[in-house]
Structure formats: C-alpha cells, structure tokens
Regions:
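N-terminal secretory signal peptides and thylakoid transit peptides that target proteins
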Residues: 1-18
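C-terminal motif of bacterial Sec signal peptides marking the signal peptidase cleavage site
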Residues: 21-22
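Structured, non-membrane catalytic/scaffold regions adjacent to prosthetic-group chemistry
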Residues: 25-234
Length: 234
C-alpha cells in the first residue's frame, strides 16, 4: 500500500523524470530506479484509482465494427498448432481441482459476447466482436482457493507469459475468447484460445493460451519484464 507521503514522493519523482527526459539526458543507470518507481506508481494509480471491478467498458453496435485488427506476423518457422483437436488448456495453481480442458468443454460453458474497442499500446484502436467463456466461470469450475491473488497466463510459445491481478481477471468482461466477429478465432489472433478484456491494453491479452495458474505471488511477464506497465489498464 502506498501512503500519502510515498504518493507525494513518487509524484515529485515523475516531475523530475519528465524534466530529465525533456533535457534529453538519460542519466545512465542512476535514472533506472526512479523510472521503476514511476512505473510502479502508474500501476498503483491504474489499479487502485481508475479500475473498478464493477465498471464496464462501453459496448458498440455490430455495425460499428472497423477493419480487421492488426495482428502478429506469423513466421513460417513458427511452431503453429498442427492439430487443434489435440489442444488443451491446463488450469492449476491455487485451485481445489486442477483441470485439463478441451475447446469443446470450454465452448459448453456459459458464453459471453460483446462488441468493444480494442486499444493497443502503440496508439491505434479498433472495434470488434469477441465471444468466449468468462474467466470467472473457469475459476469457479476449478474451485479457486481464497489464497489466490493473481493469475499467470502462458502461451504455447515457450517463455511468453503474462500476469494479472485477480480483480482484473475476475472482471465480468474478462473472457477466454475462442471467437471473433461471428467466426472461430483465427490463428493470427491467437487461435484456438486467447485472453481478452476491453479494460486492458492489447499486450496484456495472451494469445495461443495453453495454461493459466492461480498464484499468491505477483507473476512477471514477457513485456512487463522489459519495462512495460504491469497493470496495463485502459
């Protein structure tokens, strides 16, 4: 928890960092701790002030959908899933009943569909329709334990992971998406399953999802470990 004194110290640090950046001086390694403090402050503001588990992102009419969203470039050398029928989602960690779920099992669970605006950290946005199973329903099915505070999401691409706080993960608009724009989720957008929420920036939504783990400790992530904001809220 950040108290008032720490809040003021971080705010002052943010102003100093802005001045440093404006002067075009990187300060060497000495500035890094200050920048990390500012990043943590931004995460705190996003999570504790702007985010609410009851606040929903606005929805749009299907007619307002925009052109196809930009997507990952898929290299021919990338080990894509050759047999989608063999794909499974591993759910474990702080749950009473760890499970291995097929796509058919996920599609048989309660379904959420919405048309929302997707926001990328690079500055572009687009409107699309997504459908899938609420992550909260998967947590309930597996018996999430009260000690759980975070969720780690792993892609089939070894080493690519993401971490969310539990409140964001259990938000009613957080889904494990298997469909986009009235069609099955395409490979370029993370088929057969991806994490999706209109309350987060795009880099927080793990594609090609193969496992999720409920934890008591805050997990890192591929982009977050390189300096991107951990909370990543819109």
């Amino acid at each position: 928890m950040i108290d008032r004194r720490a809040l003021l110290r971080l705010a002052a640090g943010a102003g100093t960092a802005s001045l440093v950046a404006a002067c075009g001086w990187d300060g060497g390694n000495g500035v890094r701790p200050l920048l990390l403090d500012i990043s943590r402050f931004n995460d705190w503001v996003g999570e504790k002030i702007f985010f609410s588990p009851r606040r929903l992102a606005p929805q749009y009419d299907v007619a307002q959908r925009t052109a196809v969203l930009p997507s990952y470039f898929i290299s021919p050398e990338m080990p894509m899933l050759r047999d989608p029928a063999a794909w499974r989602l591993q759910v474990g960690g702080l749950v009473r009943e760890p499970q291995t779920l097929s796509l058919d099992q996920l599609q048989a669970m309660p379904r959420t569909t919405y048309t929302v605006k997707h926001h990328c950290v690079e500055g572009w946005s687009a409107i699309a329709t997504w459908h899938g199973v609420p992550l909260s329903a998967v947590a309930e099915r597996c018996g999430m334990l009260p000690q759980a505070r975070y969720v780690r999401f792993d892609s089939f691409d070894s080493g690519y992971s993401n971490g969310w706080d539990l409140a964001s993960a259990m938000h009613p608009q957080t889904i494990l998406a298997y469909g986009m724009n009235d069609n099955p989720l395409p490979p370029t957008h993370g088929a057969p399953l991806r994490l999706y929420s209109p309350t987060k920036l795009g880099y927080k939504m793990t594609k090609y999802l193969v496992s999720l783990t409920f934890t008591a400790e805050r997990p890192g992530g591929y982009w977050e470990d390189q300096g991107y904001p951990w909370f990543g809220g819109v």
